[in-house]
Regions:
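N-terminal core-binding DNA-recognition domain of tyrosine recombinases/integrases
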Residues: 21-84, 88-127
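Short, amphipathic alpha-helical interface elements at domain boundaries
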Residues: 35-56, 61-71, 163-293, 297, ...
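Accessory beta->alpha helical hairpin/"wing" motif in late/C-terminal subdomains of nucleic-acid enzymes
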Residues: 64, 103-117, 256-260, 265, ...
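Short amphipathic alpha-helical interaction segments
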Residues: 81-91, 250-264, 358-386
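Long, helix-rich interaction regions
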Residues: 114, 118-125, 129, 133-173, ...
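Amphipathic alpha-helical scaffolding segments comprising HEAT/armadillo-like alpha-solenoid repeats
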Residues: 372-374, 378, 446, 450, ...
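Charged, amphipathic alpha-helical linkers/stalks
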Residues: 444-478
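Structural detector for internal amphipathic alpha-helices that build alpha-solenoid repeat scaffolds
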Residues: 464-468, 475-485, 495-498, 505-515, ...
Length: 622
């Protein structure tokens, strides 16, 4: 089972959700823990529709979002189920931890109860507030209150007619509030963000040194020291002589943008017509790295001060520029500014619904250039000039099979193919800019892997994350770091594979371990004879062509057959198994099911599922 599915993998996600909920409910019953299946399923739903989509990643923000936003907004259940939702959530998270599914980059399992208790303090009042529900939930509850069968379309149609005719009493004031919330998007879930590649960051000392070298940090520090009760004009601007003095001090033509930046960063303020430094900002100014990060965070509020200040980009600066930096994040080589100009212009056209006007386009391009110049002076990006890497033009032509259309309109692709053939301005994030951009994405709840962050992860968590979120090269680097921190011992990793009750998960864990380990092929060959891992290892060896069916004994073949059926049940649910069996004559299907059900396969949890969902119903005498 995976704990990450793309938004369009509906069937795969639903099968995984059903499996995890079923296993968790059984696990909870054995321990006497609360586990309402509606809450378990909703918790997984809430993570699937989130910005990062990681079902098993839970921190304080995710816990609070589920209990204080998702449950009151969406879940329709008995009052007792709603009241005890925090208990059911804790059971789910404990089950994820116990089975090795919990993402180690979230809260430690020991810290989860406190996070749930913290959110649960506000939960009763929030879940009882009708203004927290969605419009869809309001109408669904109203229909249920009137005895409408939600599975009966005719009954639903009659109920709608009664509403239209005014025969169903409604809370119109509440409806107005819910409709406004829906219109403003307040009741909408976050859209899934693009996955980001794992990156490496320099040591903290190097980051601090880079911040101290920033020209913008130097200028903001000088400005802070200079701004000692300076008089302003009636329009709130520096007097001409003072502006010239400050410009000379800072080494700029005009100090206006830096003044705005300093005010936005909380370094100076205007008091009774005079510019004064803020005393509480003194510790910040003395810490170059802290000042750099404050300046970076406040940069996105400077749209009106960057460039011309009156282009479309300035209006949407705080939305578009972060997306531009996210695009630069993790790129293996400098990105051509021309390509970014095209995508930024397309984004601006969507915001304003303007045609491809040369005047507006020139203003957007100029402001984007000005933004890059300011970020370069800050030290967040580096600007160079040259031929762009072929990577940035390789997707501009239609693919040979036509399956993947270019990501941009045809006329834009044609324009870029011409421009990118010649040298031009290039931009990439500096290590400092990468660090700051990553911090922003982390704050937004996005998945932004960092090479080295899993060195202390539990074995199951390490392999699970590598299998789902790391490319091969980065997985090998991360695995090497983990082994280095654990005396090169692979046995804990192999034991994690053995302990995993989800066979498809165990297979993925073994695959990433063998693929990233220097002695992976030899490891797989040795594991062929492992009592628990053997069926998975043999399957991998056969798929790789390093083991033929002639090399397999009858017991080996039965073990592999059982492994395949258990994997099919996990991935597709009972329906997938029934579909497969339907391709066989009935006697052969029954014989196969009997063989799997009585197999000595070393996966008791998966075999129990097979007995319950497949073998018992199919082989029961009629």
């Amino acid at each position: 089972v995976r704990t990450f599915y793309e938004p369009d993998e509906d069937e795969e996600f639903e099968a995984a959700k059903d499996l995890i909920v079923r296993r968790c409910a059984a696990w909870a019953a054995e321990r006497g823990s609360r586990a309402d299946e509606a809450v378990l399923a909703a918790a997984l739903d809430s993570r699937h529709v989130s910005v990062d989509g990681r079902l098993a990643y839970w921190g304080r923000d995710q816990v609070r979002r589920f209990l204080c936003e998702y449950v009151p907004r969406h879940i329709i259940a008995d009052q007792d189920v709603l009241e005890r939702a925090p208990e059911s959530l804790l059971t789910l998270l404990r089950h994820l931890a116990d089975t090795g599914l919990l993402d180690p980059r979230g809260l430690d399992p020991d810290a989860l109860p406190a996070a749930i208790s913290e959110a649960a303090a506000d939960y009763p009042d929030i879940v009882a507030d009708p203004r927290r529900q969605s419009l869809a939930k309001y109408w669904t509850l109203l229909a249920l209150d009137h005895g409408v069968d939600l599975e009966d379309q005719d009954a639903l149609d009659r109920f709608q007619q009664d509403i239209d005719a005014g025969r169903v009493p409604c809370d119109h004031e509440l409806l107005d509030e819910l409709a406004i919330a829906q219109f403003l998007g307040e009741d909408q879930e976050d859209g899934r963000a693009f996955a980001q590649p794992p990156v490496a960051l320099p040591p903290p000392a190097e980051v601090a040194e880079a911040a101290a070298r920033s020209e913008t940090v130097r200028r903001l520090t000088l400005l802070y020291e200079w701004a000692d009760d300076q008089p302003l004009t009636a329009k709130g601007r520096l007097r001409a002589a003072d502006a010239r003095e400050l410009a000379a001090l800072l080494g700029v033509e005009s100090p206006q943008m830096l003044l705005a930046w300093a005010r936005t960063a909380g370094l100076v303020r205007v008091v009774k017509g005079r510019l004064r430094r803020i005393a509480k900002a003194a510790p910040l100014v003395r810490d170059p790295e802290a000042l750099w990060r404050r300046a970076f965070e406040r940069f996105f509020e400077l749209g009106a001060e960057i460039g011309t200040g009156d282009s479309i980009l300035s209006e949407w600066f705080d939305e578009i520029i972060p997306d531009v930096l996210n695009t630069l994040y993790g790129m293996p080589s400098p990105l051509p500014v021309a390509r970014l100009q095209e995508t930024v212009w397309l984004a601006c056209q969507e915001k304003y619904l303007v045609e491809d006007d040369e005047h507006w386009r020139a203003g957007v391009d100029a402001d984007l250039d000005a933004a890059f110049a300011a970020l370069a002076t800050l030290g967040a990006v580096e600007l160079t000039h040259g031929i762009a890497d072929a990577l940035y033009s390789s997707d501009l032509r239609p693919s040979d099979d036509g399956d993947e259309p270019p990501p941009l309109p045809p006329e834009v692709c044609e324009r870029l193919l011409v421009v990118l053939a010649e040298p031009g301005p290039l931009v990439h994030l500096t290590p400092l800019g990468t660090s700051a951009t990553r911090a922003r994405m982390l704050a937004d709840g996005r998945d932004v892997p960092l090479l080295g962050e899993l060195a202390g992860a539990p074995p199951a968590g390490l392999l699970g994350v590598l299998a789902q979120h790391y490319p091969e090269e980065e997985a090998a680097i991360e695995l090497a770091g983990w082994l280095s921190a654990h005396d090169g011992d692979t046995e804990p990793l192999l034991q994690a594979v053995r302990d995993c009750p989800y066979r498809t998960r165990a297979s993925a864990m073994l695959a990433v371990l063998a693929g990233a380990h220097p002695d992976g092929p030899a490891l797989l060959t040795r594991l062929r004879h492992d009592r628990v891992i053997g069926p998975i290892a043999m399957t991998a060896l056969v798929e790789e062509g390093r083991l033929s069916h002639d090399d397999l004994t009858a017991d080996d073949q039965l073990a592999m057959l059982t492994e395949a059926m258990l994997a099919l049940l996990e991935m597709g649910g009972p329906e997938a198994v029934h579909d497969q069996l339907a391709t066989l004559p009935t006697p052969a299907a029954h014989e196969l099911v009997q063989a799997v059900a009585t197999s000595p396969h070393p996966a008791p949890t998966a075999l129990t599922d097979f007995h319950t969902l497949i073998a018992t119903p199919l082989l029961r005498p009629h």
